[in-house]
Amino acid sequence: MKVVLSDGSIIGGGDLISAIYRTDLVPVPVSLEMVVKATDELKGLLGISDKLIVGDGISLTIVKSQHINMQAVKAGKRVGGLIIIAVLSGCEPLLSVASRATSLNDTSFNEVYRVLGAKIRLKGDIKLNQFICLKGQLPTKRIAISLQKEAAVTMYSDGEISVTRINDLFKGESLIYDRSALQWIDNPHVLSHGNTNFLSIDDNGSDILGSPLNNKQVGYYPRADARELQNLRRILVTKAKMVRQLDDRLNAGSVVTVDDGSSQDSLVVLTAAHRYDTGALGGRPIMATQAWLAQLEGEK
């Protein structure tokens, strides 16, 4: 994996031990976990807030840099290493608890990200009736709740972040795989546990909005209208997992069509992790992709 440092140099294969490049359908959709040898040069370039460039010019900012002693021994001494975690540049302010309260009405996700300190612009956007993040709350959690109320997700594609409704995820071009390439998750309790049937109270303070469904958890959502309650029933449920040789086509938001010759199922990638082990400390190199695939549940 090619990792470019802030001075323009590239981490060599002898210094890079392992890396996992990951995309998710979450408010901060791109991250990199990396272990490198703790050389003097790298220690000076891999500190908190330092920049990295990976892939097709994807800019990441380091949010964690930790020195460790590894099991490998060289010249009678344990080899030192650095554990690095980096996220999409501009999103790092969202990882700290809010230093002040934010309350917005008739707003959008673009405005929410900006007010919370993120230095990015969303390609696709959705209007919001209201957004609240109190002082001391985690911005990413508050954004995720708002996304859930709009039946939407955040995704990274073609160098940009966008907010996309869950229904629209399945309208893109799909990648076709044989059913045997997937490990199917057969758990009848996943849907009943994951798809909560939310209820709310009308503005008059007495009428209950929403109706409980059989075999579903029931939860209370304050000040939610009928549209939002309906959106809360529309979720992505993990149905399968795929592990294969490195396949950089698989990223969060990619549509996968599973074909067994007689029928086809459409799934979307919830999380994709691309793993690179260089074998710098011994062992064989590994380049592999693991993806978690989900199906839309709830009314479309």
Question: Where in the sequence are the language-model features?
Answer:
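Short conserved beta-strand and strand-loop elements enriched in small hydrophobics
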Residues: 3, 48-60, 253-261
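Amphipathic, non-transmembrane alpha-helical segments in extracytoplasmic/periplasmic proteins
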Residues: 34, 97-120, 135-158, 253
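An acidic/polar, Gly/Ser/Thr-rich interaction patch typically located in mid-to-C-terminal regions
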Residues: 17-45, 186-300
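Short beta-strand-centered interaction patches in the first periplasmic/extracellular domains
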Residues: 77-82, 122-194
